[in-house]
């Protein structure tokens, strides 16, 4: 038996159906407040209703910018990204700047950069200018600041 895929046309949901859509979206993925508002605006009749609904969901902790920031941060750290790349990813989610700074300040970026350097290039401190430049470019691309990069590539493992 073939089922017809029924799709609600855009810009006609309100009330309970809009709330159901919001819950359906949030069960699949964590959205920032602004992302959820933009997504729901596509289907809603009234923009003010969307804003009110998202504020209510946030107050009831169904939606949390804090959780979104933590998830993005842990994901980016697993990928070996530095503070600048992570800040950019968090800004793309349109999160509050204070929240972004709170999330980023507790991390030992020197240790992160050093571990990434060791994983890619080993523990040896390079004296060759070309190889040193390659390490610097690698860590810069990952989003680390130059002072941290220089400390990481000159660091000698103390055992």
From Swiss-Prot:
Location(s), subcellular: Cytoplasm
Main subcellular location of this protein, as a coarse class: cytoplasm
Highest taxon above the source species: Bacteria
Stored Pfam families: RecX_HTH2 (PF02631), RecX_HTH3 (PF21981)
InterPro entries, per the entry: RecX_HTH_2nd (IPR053924), RecX_HTH_3rd (IPR053925), Regulatory_RecX (IPR003783), WH-like_DNA-bd_sf (IPR036388)
One GO BP: regulation of DNA repair
Keywords: Cytoplasm
GO-annotated cellular components: cytoplasm
Purpose: Modulates RecA activity.
Family: Belongs to the RecX family.
Record PANTHER family: REGULATORY PROTEIN RECX FAMILY PROTEIN (PTHR33602:SF1)
Name of the molecule in the record: Regulatory protein RecX
Protein species of origin: Acinetobacter baylyi (strain ATCC 33305 / BD413 / ADP1)
Name of the gene this protein is made from: recX
